[in-house]
């Protein structure tokens, strides 16, 4: 299965992808983790992410392509946090097509804004992540709405979208995702 996990910051993408990887054995490429690792040596990237800015499509595509080239994408993967724009989606579909592969599913984790803010504030206190400060949270949610919602619409038109109520408990959300995996991979 080749899938995408989308959702606003705080929707549980990382948590669910961790469960998918550990319980279903599917490789997960988490762009947020990749970016945080690269930020240790790339000051320009660190400045953009720390201020809540949006990393350009060309930079993001290059980073994801590097990751996908290192993974065996033919056996399946889940992308966490990518693509976030229509240009990135087009790039991904072209990348897969050049390898005679297709996208199988897109999971949209959906959560009310007030619950997202509550989750992100709690995460900031626990982890000290600089991208979870209130001012940055508001900007990240704004960027998500502007940039990523067209991805959801495009994937829905292609029949790939599976909306998941991510306001539920972790196990309930995982079961909803697993049910889709079971249906799609039959």
From Swiss-Prot:
One of its GO terms (molecular function) is adenylate kinase activity. It comes from the Bacteria. It is an enzyme of class 2 (transferase). AMP binds at residues 31, 36, 53-55, 81-84, 88, 129, 140. It is found in: Cytoplasm. GO terms for cellular component: cytoplasm. ATP binds at residues 10-15, 123, 168. Pathway: Purine metabolism; AMP biosynthesis via salvage pathway; AMP from ADP: step 1/1. Its EC number is 2.7.4.3. PROSITE patterns: ADENYLATE_KINASE. Residues 122-132 are annotated as: LID. The keyword tRNA-binding does not apply. GO terms for biological process: AMP salvage. Residues 30-55 are annotated as: NMP. InterPro entries: Adenylat/UMP-CMP_kin (IPR000850), Adenylat_kinase_CS (IPR033690), P-loop_NTPase (IPR027417). Keywords: ATP-binding, Cytoplasm, Kinase, Nucleotide biosynthesis, Nucleotide-binding, Transferase. It catalyses: AMP + ATP = 2 ADP. Monomer. Belongs to the adenylate kinase family. Consists of three domains, a large central CORE domain and two small peripheral domains, NMPbind and LID, which undergo movements during catalysis. The LID domain closes over the site of phosphoryl transfer upon ATP binding. Assembling and dissambling the active center during each catalytic cycle provides an effective means to prevent ATP hydrolysis. Catalyzes the reversible transfer of the terminal phosphate group between ATP and AMP. Plays an important role in cellular energy homeostasis and in adenine nucleotide metabolism. This is Adenylate kinase. It comes from Tropheryma whipplei (strain Twist).
